[in-house]
Amino acid sequence: MDPSLVACPAPVSCPSRNLLLYNPVVLPPLSLEATCFLVGLVVGSFLNVVIVRIPAGRSIVRPPSACPACGASIRWYDNVPVLSWLWLRGRCRACRAIISWRYPAVELLTAVLFALAARQLGPTLDLGTALLLLAALVAITGIDLDHQIIPDVITLPGVVVGAVANLAIRPEGWADTLLGIAVGGGLFLIIILASGGGMGGGDMKLGAMMGAFLGWKLVLVAILLGVFAGGVVAIGFLSTGSKGRKDPVPFGPFLALGAVVSLLWGPSLLAWYLGRFFG
């Protein structure tokens, strides 16, 4: 028997005993981050399927993953996130066709985001809702970059899931959740009406989904950051001549970036801003 347990019979005065015996679901911070990183790799592999199949109107469940060049089914040992791509040197085992680097990139991105969320939020219910939002944002980013669309099949259920999750965790915060949806979607509705359709309805629904998860304060931070990032990139495109004024630039990835920053560091940014200018 561990002598430390004998010397400390009272549960209240023995933190190590409490952690190991009375609260087994609590993980040390590093273990939680590592666990979320591994979960993120697996989720990222699934998101690759979502990014490819949803725009094509295909099922994300069946058939199993296959090589896009030859159609050969991908065996489980060739479908291990990141590692299989490295082992096969980015090629299909059957036909040796090149497999895009985007597949491991999406897996790694999702894993890193999940680990960051674990570090920032810890073992809380908020972490669960954060992981759902991050997964949706990664999928939306990939689809918008490829097809310049933000699928309703992700954003509309996302509004419901975000609202229900937040209301379940904090029933007293219902006003913040509803205001978040109204602010996130309403700002883009105003832009759409004012510009005569200069911005798509997908951005409006994405804004509403972000608001459902983040609440009205953090969704404002997310939108401001997204607009700033999008403006910087647009200026870069125009100055280098790589895109003209009328060339479409998907805005979803910039909103997703703003939402990620707001989710992970938004409260700190708000506290800094309010203290700096109004403190």
Identify the meaning behind each predicted range.
Residues 13, 21-22:
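Short, positively charged and aromatic/hydrophobic N-terminal segments
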Residues 23-55:
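Long, highly hydrophobic alpha-helical transmembrane signal-anchor segments
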Residues 235-261:
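Interfacial loop-to-transmembrane junctions
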